[in-house]
């Protein structure tokens, strides 16, 4: 067994690419570390590995090495990662939303816990004046972020989308270098046209009866670069009629996996990215995001969740496979944001094992829709997607457990207390 571990370590070192960030948009799938590693575990990934084109798999793994000053150094490895290959990002769009909402609050000098009230937008979304999940019964950016990161709440994202505004949302991300990203619509709501999603509700912040900020209803006149993305081989339209042609995804949200991976890196390691790439957040903002990302639903009081539905690993796909049972024996925390819809399952994660001083970043997406029909809800998330994510995370984790490090990481920045 020791010889096998040493053998794979030698193969890994031979395949290492020490570039901090690969500029190419299409990363070679063959003769890479990840390709070698997946082949070594071929039986565990059959039939997924045998038909990676069908499953549209993309993987990015970041090895993290610390120096004597605990500064992180990154080595990225890609498997079939291609910024030109479309996948529906689903709820992963909520990751930049939480950061941009906090960034906007900082620009306005408003605390994240300040009550935020949203006016109605006729025919699109209703007003929000109360929030029964909050301790004080009032909506706020902080409460929306909790619900987004703990259980991937759709309405919470939509309210942040409305606060940020479609045009500002995209321009802010493009200015940070995420030029392939397009956030064009709310999520989890049918029947809103692309034009309707350009409109966002009026928002106000009030504390103790005092108006702190009033934002009028906004309209985005942003011109998006044209796209020709498609999904599936057939789909059910809004009238529940089967259309026997691919769904036009050119007006859907879009985030390449590489952009998601870099967004998470910017949040987890803000000091390791350039100032232009960094979200304008305070240290307390980062600590709040880390806390919400890594917290389990049963550890939350406000909001409080029914743990029969929102179980321990409800949003933990990589390594934990979204399994209800908890049998890990070490202190592992996952800082992540997943998304699943239209047969696409994506997870973007920073994984820590505090007991064994292990840390790594792993992002992956897989398409599990055997019949090719969208909106029929016949997707293989449980039978194919979640087991794939669990095993992929486990393989990288086991490799990291065995990998020798010159300097063990000090992970105290990410050690949280979850008692409330």
Regions from the language model: what does each represent?
Residues 2-9:
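Sec-dependent signal peptide recognition
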Residues 14-15:
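C-terminal motif of bacterial Sec signal peptides marking the signal peptidase cleavage site
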Residues 20-46, 51, 241-420:
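Structured C-terminal helix/loop/strand segments within mature extracytoplasmic catalytic/sensor domains
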Residues 39-81, 114, 362-364:
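A short, well-structured edge-of-sheet supersecondary motif
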Residues 52-56, 74-76, 82-84, 88-93, ...:
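Extracytoplasmic
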Residues 87-116, 362:
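Active-site SXXK
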